[in-house]
Design a protein with these regions (language model features):
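Conserved AMP-binding A3 loop
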Residues: 45-49, 178-204
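Conserved AMP-binding/adenylate-forming core of the ANL superfamily
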Residues: 34-80, 84-88, 105-110, 114, ...
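Conserved C-terminal "lid"/linker of ANL adenylate-forming enzymes
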Residues: 489, 544, 548-606
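Conserved AMP-binding/adenylation subdomain of ANL enzymes
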Residues: 201-220, 227-335, 345
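Structural core segment of the AMP-binding/adenylate-forming
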Residues: 64-65, 92-156, 546
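Conserved ATP-dependent adenylate/AMP-binding module captured primarily in the ANL superfamily
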Residues: 87, 102-135, 203-222, 252-266, ...
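Conserved pre-ATP/AMP-binding loop-to-beta segment of ANL
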Residues: 30-33, 158-182, 189, 214-220
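Conserved ATP-binding/catalytic segment of the ANL
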Residues: 400-466
Length: 606
């Protein structure tokens, strides 16, 4: 097994900072459509020239308000076009962007501001303005119309000369700080990672070099992930640099509806969105009394996806006649409708921010929408590895991007060195153990195959050491259970215990649908009202019997010592605003287990 793999050399480029990406597009394609704004009448196009002019006007306002080169600007807003303006305008003025997740608690907002000391803040709406003001932010301006809105900020800078903006634009070099991005904090407190201009432009160039079939001038994408997350901002910069049209949609409930209007060719998604799309197909089939037929179609799609994967490196591979006929039949009946649901133009999806179930990856490839899996962290400026078209392997997160090296330490930890790796943190203490021999320690466990493809096996901090000394990585078991549409999150527990048990956090909407369709209406009252902080226990016999199936399947796939002997089913707040869920919908494991400790104890006392 390989211990190290490197991507190709990064192609030479002349970009010194992130604003050079925009300046280059203004020079080469000023009238090309860079952004689309969703309106009731349709999409309102914004050219590269128009975006650049708006950014420069906003930069003048920031300068007029006293922003100096190197000063920090906090941005707290949902994903929207004005976020992109704020990002580039701050850099044009010589500032450093500090994103604040719009779902942050008051304590988190206060901690972010105290740790990074921004001199000015840009808020999405009144609720974000109030959150920033209450946390002590100075000079707060809002993106929504109001007395201190972006129009007023722009107006304040009318006397700032164009030459001053251009002078400041050229100040930052590759080693200068561009943004301070907080980690998601799934297992520990958030850390404020420094991302330089060199990190940003290097990763943008690497992405364009690695995926020219995906990132190009004729491509269109919807950005629905939080722009406070480095993955979404990296995509936005890559799209801007390559000429890809970007449309923002900050309301997750409207993303599927945006497909028909925007008709994207590519999207970065989280696995939960893919599951929702598949579930939409199931729901429509059930409504048409075709549920069993759709289940057969799902099986066919997965089999077809596996065939396509095998055929990548074996030109002689042929599907069975039965599979080919079944796929053609279900394509007419279901698959083309699912593609139409996504706008009927999607060529590629990139899944990031959380592990993707291989079966789900095969399903989407089987319906004609291949999924590229990638891997990265805040500290690697998002992608460090990724699968390539022509070499899609479900369960793998691909080979290193150009300019990046992956090493596997003796204990299995994934180490990263390369163009996107952070130089450190705002609090130097956070970086004391972050590097070894020039490589960043990711905290993830993984392995490399002979072709240099990386597989992630779990988090070091999530390892469970049982009373017998057995080390158990919980992620494989948890991933198997969450294949059930009823389960939003599964958590294996058993640190210093004689055996393992599990907590299943259910999806209330999925449970509601199951209850209505399975003839168990007495489950519905159990879902009413807001659950307590530690979750509400659901002990309905039929529901528990239904949940036992995915638990049994997961147990069958692991050794006896890694099996859960009992489980508890809970409903809790699992939206992005939950204190237990990150903005990218990953579970904050330690915080949740602490809140659910009473439920866990019952698994060992009964």
């Amino acid at each position: 097994m390989r211990r190290e793999a490197s991507g190709p050399e990064l192609a030479d480029h002349t970009f010194r900072n992130a604003t050079d990406l925009l300046a280059d597009r203004v020079h080469t394609a000023p009238d090309h459509v860079a952004f689309g704004l969703r309106t009731d009448e349709g999409l309102l196009d914004v050219s590269t020239r128009g975006f650049d002019a708006a950014c420069r006007d906003l930069a003048k306002g920031l300068i007029a308000q006293g922003l100096q080169p190197g000063d920090r600007v906090a941005v707290m807003a949902p994903t929207r076009y004005a976020w992109a303006l704020a990002d580039l305008a701050t850099w044009l003025a010589g500032g450093v962007v500090v994103p604040v997740y719009e779902t942050s608690s008051p304590d988190q907002v206060a901690a972010t501001l105290a740790g990074t000391t921004p001199v000015l803040a840009l808020a999405g709406g009144p609720e974000h303005r109030d959150a920033l003001t209450d946390a002590g932010a100075a000079s707060v301006w809002t993106m929504d119309a109001g007395s201190r809105d972006l129009a007023a900020l722009v107006a304040s800078g009318r006397e700032v000369p164009d030459a001053e903006v251009e002078r400041r634009r050229r100040l930052a070099g590759p080693d200068d700080l561009a943004t301070i991005v907080h980690t998601s904090g799934t297992t520990a407190r958030q850390k404020a990672a420094h991302i330089t201009h060199g990190n940003l432009v290097g990763v943008v160039q690497a992405v364009r070099q690695a995926w020219p079939e995906v990132v190009h001038e004729d491509a269109v994408t919807i950005i629905a992930l939080p722009l406070a997350h480095i993955l979404a901002r990296g995509l936005q910069l890559a799209a801007l640099g390559a000429g890809m049209k970007v449309v923002h949609e900050g309301d997750r409930t409207r993303v599927v509806g945006a497909f028909a209007q925007v008709r994207p060719t590519f999207m970065v998604v989280v696995p939960q969105l893919l599951e929702k799309i598949r579930q939409a197909g199931r729901d429509r089939a059930n409504d048409a009394r075709l549920g069993p037929v759709f289940r057969a179609a799902e099986t066919t799609a997965v089999a077809w996806g596996r065939h396509l994967e095998a055929a990548q490196h074996d030109p002689a591979a042929r599907p069975t006649r039965r599979l080919a006929l079944a796929h053609a039949f279900f394509d007419r009946l279901f698959f083309r409708r699912l593609r139409r649901l996504m706008g009927d133009r999607v060529e590629w999806l990139l899944s990031g921010a959380a592990p993707l179930d291989p079966t789900l990856a095969h399903f989407f490839r089987g319906i004609g929408v291949p999924v590229i899996e990638g891997y990265g962290l805040t500290e690697t400026t998002a992608p460090a590895t990724g699968l390539r078209p022509g070499d899609l392997r479900a369960g793998s997160v691909g080979t290193p991007i150009p300019g990046t090296t992956i090493r596997i330490a003796d204990d299995g930890e994934v180490l990263v060195r390369g163009v996107g790796v952070t130089p450190g943190y705002e609090d130097a203490r956070d970086g004391e153990d972050a590097f070894v021999d020039g490589f960043f320690r990711t905290g993830d466990l993984g392995s490399l195959d002979e072709a240099g493809r990386l597989r992630i096996h779990g988090r070091r901090k999530n390892l469970i050491v049982t009373a017998s000394g057995k080390n158990v990585a919980p992620e494989p078991w948890e991933a198997a259970v969450t294949r059930s549409p009823l389960v939003a999150h599964a958590v294996l527990v058993g640190e210093a215990r004689s055996h393992l048990t599990a907590v299943l956090l259910l999806d209330p909407d999925a449970v509601r649908r199951w209850a209505e369709r399975s003839g168990n209406p007495d489950v519905l009252p159990l879902l009413a009202g807001d659950p307590p902080p530690g979750g509400r226990r659901l002990d309905h016999p039929a529901l528990l019997a239904r949940l036992q199936r995915p638990v049994d399947r997961a147990n069958a796939a692991v050794s006896r010592a890694e099996q859960a002997r009992a489980f508890v089913a809970l409903v809790a707040d699992t939206t992005a605003s939950s204190p237990f869920v990150t903005p990218t919908l990953k579970l904050q494991r330690d915080a949740f287990l602490s809140a659910a400790s009473t439920h866990i104890e019952t698994l060992y006392t009964t």
